[in-house]
């Protein structure tokens, strides 16, 4: 992904993390609470098999849609 799109995507991931703060269900591996920013970044990495910076530009809109899905479906 080009630098401009990667920068935009990182900001969107941060905004999604802000939105999900306190909304993720509890998990025994995270007794002090879950990190919503890491959750979003890890979900993106798992779905696209690459860090957000390494996803092709052609999938930018697909990544945006997936982040929106994560916001609507905290898990």
Language model features with spans:
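Positively charged, phosphate-engaging catalytic surfaces used for nucleic-acid and nucleotide handling
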Residues: 1-75
């Amino acid at each position: 992904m080009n630098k401009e799109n990667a920068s935009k995507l990182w900001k969107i991931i941060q905004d999604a993390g802000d939105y999900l703060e306190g909304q993720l269900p509890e998990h025994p591996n995270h007794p002090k609470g879950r990190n919503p920013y890491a959750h979003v970044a890890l979900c993106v990495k798992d779905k696209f098999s690459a860090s957000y910076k390494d996803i092709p530009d052609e999938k930018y809109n697909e990544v945006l849609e997936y982040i929106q899905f994560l916001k609507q479906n905290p898990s």
